């Protein structure tokens, strides 16, 4: 998690962010969330991205810009200590509705990256873990959108986390995106 190996958490967890972003979203009690994004420049990565992050040598630290956007929370019980504003009732949008949501949010993320002159974009599996989004839906949305941005960046990479015992998210993303 980027928040564990950088100063991102401290940039996102400020009174201004709570006032403008988190508090209004929690008050909505909507596990689908909305299309808002947060662009955070100049994040310093100073720990390794391992199970137990370790401080890197100072010469190995690097700076990245981060774009934050919430994925739909499709958990059976969406509210927990980390998502206390997501309500207590599960939502069940259709795969088509979810694909539209994912495409819109991904376009916002990539538009922000273009506006801020990013040359490399690293995207995740956007909700396919803890938020229970279907990898096929998210990967298909990503493929549809990324086609329109292929020449806007030097690199578009997907970092898809998998548990050692289950690489299904990776296999789905690899299958869907391999034709790009």
Residue ranges and their predicted role:
Residues 1-180:
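Macrodomain-like recognition of ADP-ribose-binding/processing modules
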């Amino acid at each position: 998690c980027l928040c564990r190996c950088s100063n991102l958490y401290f940039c996102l967890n400020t009174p201004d962010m709570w006032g403008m972003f988190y508090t209004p979203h929690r008050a909505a009690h909507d596990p689908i969330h909305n299309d808002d994004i947060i662009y955070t420049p100049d994040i310093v990565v100073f720990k390794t991205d391992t199970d137990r992050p370790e401080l890197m040598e100072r010469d190995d630290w690097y700076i990245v810009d981060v774009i934050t956007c919430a994925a739909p929370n499709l958990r059976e019980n969406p509210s927990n200590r980390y998502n206390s504003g997501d309500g207590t009732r599960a939502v069940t949008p259709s795969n088509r509705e979810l694909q539209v949501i994912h495409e819109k949010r991904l376009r916002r993320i990539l538009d922000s990256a273009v506006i801020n002159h990013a040359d490399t974009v690293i995207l995740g599996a956007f909700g396919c873990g803890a938020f229970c989004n279907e990898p096929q839906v998210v990967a298909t949305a990503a493929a549809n959108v990324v086609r329109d941005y292929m020449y806007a960046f030097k690199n578009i990479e997907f970092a898809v986390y998998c548990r050692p015992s289950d690489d299904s998210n990776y296999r789905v993303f690899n299958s869907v995106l391999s034709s790009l």
